[in-house]
């Protein structure tokens, strides 16, 4: 059976092992088609095994993590594509489209898997750049909606929007409003109350 790189040789022992994992050979072929990643923006890992790697083989498959309902389904599938090994020691040889903090060559645990799926859902909802900026300052997504303010060209532009939305400085200062120091105000805002990420998305500090 062809993987992306290398093959799973179907022998009677492999068929028996697949049966233990609740797969038939045709079902595994269908599952490979369903879970194989196109590496086109979906969170993915390239899964091999330490046994094959130590034997000089890069046999493996790019797998779309978002195509699974849960961690157990993912692990079971990974074991199935290496049913020619009695107890495959899974190896994540590369990754794409999720933060490095959840990548582990020695393989991810269930918490990391769930974080990656949540990250993917947040990116679909809010956009990759906004979510990546948020991740610069927060470890989980619990406070995204409360913290997110929007996107601005610069910290000073954000400061201007705060002044325009919250203060009528022309009324209170008259012509002196032309001399208001937006740059200094922005420095104060982002020193204490706000963060701006690399893609110019602003988040309130909570």
Spans of model-derived segments:
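Residue-level signature of catalytic and energy-coupling elements of molecular machines
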Residues: 18, 63, 181
């Amino acid at each position: 059976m062809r993987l992306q790189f290398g093959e799973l040789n179907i022998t009677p022992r492999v068929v028996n092992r697949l049966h233990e994992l609740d797969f038939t050979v045709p079902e595994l072929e269908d599952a490979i088609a369903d879970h194989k990643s196109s590496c086109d923006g979906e969170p993915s890992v390239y899964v091999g095994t330490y046994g094959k790697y130590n034997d000089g083989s890069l046999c493996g498959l790019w797998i779309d993590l978002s195509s699974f309902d849960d961690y157990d389904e993912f692990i079971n599938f990974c074991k199935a594509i290496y049913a020619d090994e009695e107890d495959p020691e899974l190896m994540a040889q590369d990754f794409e489209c999720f933060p490095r903090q959840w990548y582990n060559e020695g393989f991810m645990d269930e918490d990391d898997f769930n974080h990656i799926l949540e990250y993917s859902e947040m990116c679909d909802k809010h956009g990759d750049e906004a979510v990546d900026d948020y991740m610069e300052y927060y470890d989980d997504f619990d406070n995204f909606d409360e913290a997110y303010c929007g996107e601005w060209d610069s910290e000073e532009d954000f400061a201007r929007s705060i002044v325009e939305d919250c203060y009528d400085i022309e009324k209170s200062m008259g012509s002196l409003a032309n001399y208001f120091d937006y740059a200094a105000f922005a420095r104060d805002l982002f020193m204490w109350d706000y963060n701006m990420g690399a893609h110019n998305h602003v988040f309130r500090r909570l």
